[in-house]
């Protein structure tokens, strides 16, 4: 019999990408469905998802395309961008990413698929890299304690304003910003200040703080160093004057300039902020980049964001961990120091490694070359009669050309260079690591000047004041001197990566975190220079490909969520929350309802919800959670009635943080609307809804999404992320905008949330590609398989562990909660013991003690195949059997594989005095010696690290293996 001939059209399609993204194949799905008692995915989700929220129609999205087709489309979009020499400045500069860092960090899934290092024993490589970053920032700024990254320079400055108000002695008065500060930073500060009643005053501080401002009281001062105009001036007198007024002083500093200039700490600053973008991180049309903040020691315990510290493990060996977590949003909620959750870990690692790679001498060489080009450029312009405004500068010139500025900028553009049009009479020109002689000549030609670079190089003097030159050594730690050769650097990066656990090793079943596949085809384009080398303030006609991609992504996200408008500017989920709440606030105020400031939040909500609400000027009122995991309807109704006239918004997560589809969500939304409030649906769990239900259609007025969860941007070990905000039409006028790019948002918007007009635009091609690869039907099936996987795990584990919550049909959504409290009470085995024992079996722990203390929240996602799901279930069942050995007395309660977990290879050497064997410790059932992941340290003493806070690199002898 002749086999059936396959048509060419079918052969051309190949294997659909959907089958690459979704882990379980059709046969595996059938087995899983049988386990949970359903015949098809449609039957399962029909039973799990409440009828009242179901979408009647399929997603109206372009049909799925192959990887080759999508990459070709991306290439076509990239080709529509024009990358000119980026001499605009304003905090964004051309930089050269060392290929060893590009290939082995930015393009390496061992780095970019990891999660925030809440499990420090399996995050030691990443934590060491972040400690390098903190040490680099601390040494260059001259301040002893640096955090592990913030979102960008603008938000770092806004966080500094909040910190100044929180820790300073002056509790009232104004926040004073020098007029020569980056304009986007000023705008972000003003956006952040207004809801909390902080008055921001922008003034020229070149001659000190004006008396009329000093008389009003000043709680904080921000100085740019060097200034946005490029000016380098002595800021120490202003710092001294501010301190006399009791103000906290923040200096927004350029790290490359600080290799040559006196540090902010040496000048007396209390806080330093900025961006590390020019340390090897592509501009990416605005991001992502790692912002930074460093502070005096007395403010360390009030820092926003993550802070890596040095502690010890159970054997007394040096180990790293996240320090002082009790000040963060996931614990302190509305009392947190900040709403920052996702930061910019991957980019911080890159920037820190850039300093490791170049060392102090290499960085100074780059700085001197950049400055030399600026000085040569200035002398050439002066020789042609052009007025260079400032005599002292580092890399940026401002020149006065009355009435000619626009023409000069246009002429430079014709010659392949982008300059900054300051106003009709002034042009600004910034040099950077990538500046070339030909670019200098092109700029001269645009001004009608010419020069001899060799002759000027021999004659030109530095334009940095002698009194402001740095005299102390920088980057003195051995880590910045040991890895000069690429061989050494490559091996260092490999050594650190091998210490960590990321998705390239195995499943990371963190509930509410959606650790799904980050496909290589989705990632590939972000390193293309047509996307990566584009300046965020480049003219719109040079960014047509990027702007088209952004518009299409916003439209497709609106279709997925059921909203009318989407802004992708927020560069983290927390910032999307803030943007959405600001839109709600602005809407109420536009209607004359200024008194509507109460934000109702269920007790089970993400910690960022409450922290963001406080930042948006709202009063948080907590709503109880019922025993079944849903919002307590009676308590909610009572709170609505109690605050009817002041109700601004209800924030709910859907499906709930308890992993269930709440049946009453539409009813809840209706009652809030009847009381005059808005409904904010937190999109953290959108992976359970895509293609099945739309928040904007079942009662939501506003939601943020997490592109680093649902839409495949990798978590990067703690960032980057993107938190777009979607709104219904009545809130659309109040989305974020930007003063330097009018197209970035509505004229009536609330101001910028992020420093860049389109936030972390450089990683948006990832989500664009995911949606394009999957199509509407593929996205729906991904959701259905995610729900199937969670229910499969729940069914397999239910005979061994209590499953805390489920819906009316006995089903969970995309995650399930395993309750360890009865087991812990009966046996003394803690949730920490189980989490650390999972490491011995080769797993990252699920989410611990959220939203309920003493539980594990498991989210497998659609990307894990059946073999991995079964390996996890088998492991949990094996651990349950180990717990029984403790309960029965076979193993001592204080000496067993759980209480001593994790076990390192080093622990196997020497005497073994435990009541269980070495094999039981490190090769429990199902663990292969050939594939074993060995944690580099034993259980870490968190309390020791917080009591003895050390947040920079230990001395060299501490690195001995």
Swiss-Prot record:
Pfam families for the chain: GcvP2_C, GDC-P
Cofactor section: pyridoxal 5'-phosphate
Alphabetical keyword list: Oxidoreductase, Pyridoxal phosphate
Residue positions, PTM N6-(pyridoxal phosphate)lysine: 709
Keyword Oxidoreductase recorded: yes
Any single biological process term in GO: glycine decarboxylation via glycine cleavage system
EC numbers, comma separated: 1.4.4.2
GO molecular function: glycine binding; glycine dehydrogenase (decarboxylating) activity; pyridoxal phosphate binding
Enzymatic reactions: N(6)-[(R)-lipoyl]-L-lysyl-[glycine-cleavage complex H protein] + glycine + H(+) = N(6)-[(R)-S(8)-aminomethyldihydrolipoyl]-L-lysyl-[glycine-cleavage complex H protein] + CO2
GO cellular component: cytosol; glycine cleavage complex
Coiled-coil ranges from the UniProt annotation: none
Family as reported in the entry's similarity comment: Belongs to the GcvP family.
Subunit organization: The glycine cleavage system is composed of four proteins: P, T, L and H.
Purpose of the protein: The glycine cleavage system catalyzes the degradation of glycine. The P protein binds the alpha-amino group of glycine through its pyridoxal phosphate cofactor; CO(2) is released and the remaining methylamine moiety is then transferred to the lipoamide cofactor of the H protein.
NCBIfam families attached to this UniProt entry: gcvP, PRK00451.1, PRK04366.1
Designated name of the protein: Glycine dehydrogenase (decarboxylating)
Annotated source species: Streptomyces griseus subsp. griseus (strain JCM 4626 / CBS 651.72 / NBRC 13350 / KCC S-0626 / ISP 5235)
Source organism phylogeny: Bacteria, Bacillati, Actinomycetota, Actinomycetes, Kitasatosporales
């Amino acid at each position: 019999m002749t086999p059936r001939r396959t048509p060419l059209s079918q052969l051309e399609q190949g294997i659909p990408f959907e089958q690459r993204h979704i882990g379980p194949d059709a046969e595996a799905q059938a087995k899983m469905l049988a386990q949970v008692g359903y015949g098809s995915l449609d039957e399962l989700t029909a039973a799990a998802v409440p009828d009242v929220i179901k979408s009647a129609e399929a997603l109206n999205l372009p049909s799925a395309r192959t990887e080759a087709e999508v990459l070709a489309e991306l290439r076509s979009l990239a080709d529509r961008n024009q990358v000119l020499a980026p001499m605009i400045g304003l905090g964004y500069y051309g930089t050269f990413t060392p290929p060893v860092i590009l290939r082995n960090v930015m393009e390496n899934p061992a780095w970019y698929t990891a999660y925030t290092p809440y499990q420090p024993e399996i995050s030691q490589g990443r934590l060491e890299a972040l400690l390098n970053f903190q040490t680099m920032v601390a040494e260059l700024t001259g301040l002893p304690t640096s955090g592990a990254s913030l979102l960008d320079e603008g938000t770092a400055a806004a966080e500094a304003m909040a910190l100044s108000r929180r820790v300073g002695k002056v509790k009232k008065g104004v926040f004073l910003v020098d007029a020569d500060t980056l304009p986007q930073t000023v705008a972000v500060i003003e956006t952040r200040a207004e809801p909390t009643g902080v008055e921001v005053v922008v003034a020229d501080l070149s001659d000190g703080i004006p008396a009329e401002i000093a008389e009003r009281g000043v709680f904080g001062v921000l100085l740019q160093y060097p200034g946005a105009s490029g000016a380098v001036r002595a800021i120490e007198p202003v710092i001294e004057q501010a301190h006399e007024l009791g103000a906290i002083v923040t200096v927004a500093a350029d790290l490359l300039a600080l290799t040559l200039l006196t540090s902010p700490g040496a000048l007396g600053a209390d806080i330093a902020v900025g961006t590390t973008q020019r340390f090897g991180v592509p501009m990416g049309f605005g991001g992502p980049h790692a912002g930074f903040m460093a502070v005096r020691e007395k403010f360390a315990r009030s820092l926003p964001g993550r802070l890596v510290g040095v502690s010890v493990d159970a054997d007394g060996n040096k180990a790293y961990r996240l320090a002082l977590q009790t000040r963060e949003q996931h614990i302190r909620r509305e009392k947190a120091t900040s709403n920052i959750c996702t930061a910019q870990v991957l980019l911080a690692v890159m920037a820190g490694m850039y300093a490791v790679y170049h060392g102090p001498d290499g960085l100074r060489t780059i700085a001197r070359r950049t400055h030399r080009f600026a000085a040569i450029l200035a002398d050439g312009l002066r020789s042609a009669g052009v007025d260079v405004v400032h005599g002292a500068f580092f890399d940026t010139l401002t020149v006065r050309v009355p009435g000619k500025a626009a023409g000069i900028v246009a002429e430079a553009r014709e010659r392949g260079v982008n300059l900054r049009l300051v106003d009709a009479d002034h042009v600004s020109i910034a040099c950077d690591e990538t500046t070339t002689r030909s670019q200098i000549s092109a700029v001269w030609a645009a001004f009608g000047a010419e020069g001899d670079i060799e002759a000027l190089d021999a004659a030109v003097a530095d334009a940095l004041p002698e009194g402001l030159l740095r005299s102390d050594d920088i980057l003195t730690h051995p880590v910045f001197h040991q890895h000069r050769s690429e061989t050494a650097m490559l091996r260092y990066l490999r050594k650190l990566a091998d210490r960590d656990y990321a998705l390239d090793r195995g499943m990371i079943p963190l509930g509410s975190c959606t650790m799904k596949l980050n496909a290589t085809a989705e990632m590939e384009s972000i390193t293309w220079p047509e996307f990566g080398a584009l300046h965020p303030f480049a003219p719109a006609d040079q960014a047509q490909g990027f702007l088209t991609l952004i518009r299409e992504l916003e439209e497709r996200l609106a279709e997925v969520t059921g909203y009318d408008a989407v802004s992708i500017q927020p560069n983290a989920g927390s910032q999307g929350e803030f943007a959405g709440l600001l839109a709600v606030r602005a809407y109420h105020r536009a209607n004359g309802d200024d008194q509507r400031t109460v934000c109702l939040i269920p007790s089970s909500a993400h910690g960022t919800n409450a922290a963001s609400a406080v930042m948006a000027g709202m009063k948080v009122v907590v709503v109880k959670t019922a025993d079944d995991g849903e919002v307590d309807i009676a308590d909610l109704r009572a709170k609505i009635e109690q605050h009817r006239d002041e109700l601004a918004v209800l924030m709910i997560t859907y499906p709930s943080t308890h992993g269930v589809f709440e049946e009453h969500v539409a009813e809840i939304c209706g009652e809030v609307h009847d009381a005059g409030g808005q409904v904010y649906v937190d999109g953290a769990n959108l992976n359970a809804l895509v293609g099945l239900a739309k928040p904007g259609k079942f009662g939501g007025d506003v939601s943020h999404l997490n592109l680093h969860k649902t839409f495949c941007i990798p978590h990067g070990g703690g960032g980057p992320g993107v938190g777009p905000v979607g709104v219904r039409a009545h809130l659309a006028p109040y989305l974020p905008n930007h003063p330097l790019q009018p197209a970035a948002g509505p004229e009536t918007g609330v101001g910028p949330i992020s420093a860049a007009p389109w936030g972390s635009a450089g990683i948006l091609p990832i989500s664009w590609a995911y949606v394009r690869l999957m199509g509407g039907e593929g996205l729906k099936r991904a959701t259905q398989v995610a729900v199937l996987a969670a229910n499969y795990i729940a069914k397999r584990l239910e005979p061994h562990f209590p499953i805390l919550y489920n819906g009316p049909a006995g089903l969970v959504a995309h995650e399930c909660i395993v309750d360890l409290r009865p087991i812990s009470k009966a046996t003394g085995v803690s949730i920490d013991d189980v989490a650390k024992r999972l490491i011995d079996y080769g797993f990252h722990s699920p989410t611990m003690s959220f939203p309920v203390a003493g539980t594990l929240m498991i989210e497998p996602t659609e990307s894990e195949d059946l073999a991995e799901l079964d390996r996890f279930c088998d492991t949990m069942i094996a651990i349950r059997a180990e717990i029984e050995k403790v309960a029965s007395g076979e193993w001592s309660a204080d000496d067993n594989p759980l209480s001593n977990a994790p076990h390192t290879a080093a622990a196997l050497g020497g005497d073994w005095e435990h009541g269980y064997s070495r094999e039981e410790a490190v090769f429990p059932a199902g663990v292969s010696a050939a594939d074993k992941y060995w944690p580099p340290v034993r259980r870490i003493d968190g309390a020791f690290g917080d009591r003895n806070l050390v947040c920079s690199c230990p001395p060299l002898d501490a690195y001995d293996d």
